[in-house]
């Protein structure tokens, strides 16, 4: 297998991982919007899928040493708005992938960060209910 073929295979895996992240993120957003039970699980699944796609993305495009800045944490942020913002970041990451892999990676890391923040808020809220 030559380098070009290996790169093509890696890019296909990134595409599939980004699709899965999108699917799980959409499911989490739908679940949150409709007031489903245990929303923290759906958000966690989306977070894990985004984290995995971020790992594949960084390996595929040689960005392992990049450490994008962390977005400013919003006080009293609502999980639903964080998940919506992460969906927008994921969309931008997917769009920028072919144009600027570094910029796309930054948006992808923002997606992960916001999902992680939403998950943390939901976990705390769930613990308070118990």
Please provide the spans of the model-predicted regions.
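Short terminal alpha-helical segments
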Residues: 2-53, 112, 116
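Short intrinsically disordered terminal tails
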Residues: 1-2, 63, 67, 126-130
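Amphipathic alpha-helical binding modules
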Residues: 81-130
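Non-transmembrane amphipathic alpha-helical segments
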Residues: 24-28, 59, 86-89, 93
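Heptad-repeat coiled-coil alpha-helices
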Residues: 34, 41, 58, 62-65, ...
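Residue-level recognition of alpha-helical structural elements
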Residues: 10, 38-42, 75, 100-107
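Short, solvent-exposed, charged loop/turn and helix-capping segments
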Residues: 55-80
């Amino acid at each position: 297998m030559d380098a070009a073929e290996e790169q093509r295979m890696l890019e296909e895996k990134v595409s599939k991982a980004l699709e899965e992240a999108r699917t799980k993120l959409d499911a989490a957003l739908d679940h949150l919007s409709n007031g489903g039970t245990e929303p923290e699980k759906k958000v966690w699944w989306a977070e894990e899928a985004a984290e995995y796609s971020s790992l594949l993305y960084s390996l595929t495009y040689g960005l392992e040493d990049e450490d994008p800045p962390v977005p400013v944490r919003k006080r009293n942020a609502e999980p639903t708005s964080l998940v919506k913002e992460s969906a927008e970041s994921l969309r931008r990451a997917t769009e920028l992938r072919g144009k600027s892999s570094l910029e796309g990676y930054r948006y992808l890391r923002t997606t992960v960060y916001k999902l992680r923040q939403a998950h943390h808020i939901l976990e705390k809220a769930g613990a308070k209910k118990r």
